[in-house]
């Protein structure tokens, strides 16, 4: 992260910390949950960040390796049988434990938040890591008075540039005018 901050004189916000901070603020009597990709869960990054808030216990971490492929293949409606089955399979231990809040630790997972809420119930708070990061970045830009004027759109992806337009339309609800680059 230091290299990025040194190379670009712009505010940089990661996805992990803002979401974890919000989740930690919801800690109370009920356990908390974190769902993310297998690589993210296995890295221990969420665990280490939550430990900074004194939350060494009472957190259930669950890797959900089927979520991203399902979402990217168009299965994200709360009525979709494949998503409903995957949500139930991965989140059953959290439901049984009575978690009070779940961090959606992957940017894709916001697309299935309705299916997660349907399964877990409205009393379980869902925290979107991507929404928390966007809010933090927006706040930083306002503080630095960098919200006015015109900007330009530039999309960078670590994935396939050919898939970008289709996926962007799903995530954004509109088709970007420009394609993505690596």
Model regions and ranges:
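Non-catalytic structural scaffold of enzyme domains
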Residues: 1-182
């Amino acid at each position: 992260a230091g290299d990025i901050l040194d190379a670009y004189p712009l505010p940089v916000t990661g996805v992990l910390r803002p979401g974890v901070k919000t989740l930690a603020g919801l800690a109370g009597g009920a356990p908390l949950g974190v769902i993310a990709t297998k690589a993210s869960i296995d890295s221990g990054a969420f665990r280490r960040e939550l430990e900074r808030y004194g939350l060494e216990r009472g957190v259930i971490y669950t890797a959900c390796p089927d979520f991203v492929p399902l979402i990217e293949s168009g299965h994200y409606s709360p009525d979709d049988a494949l998503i409903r089955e995957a949500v139930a399979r991965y989140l059953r231990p959290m439901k049984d434990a009575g978690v009070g809040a779940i961090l959606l630790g992957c940017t894709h997972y916001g697309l299935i938040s309705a299916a997660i809420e349907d399964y877990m119930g409205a009393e379980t708070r869902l925290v979107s890591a991507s929404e928390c990061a966007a809010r933090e970045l927006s706040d930083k830009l306002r503080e630095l008075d960098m919200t006015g004027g015109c900007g330009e759109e530039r999309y960078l992806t670590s994935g396939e540039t050919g898939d970008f337009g289709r996926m962007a339309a799903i995530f954004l609800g509109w088709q970007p005018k420009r394609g993505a680059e690596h």
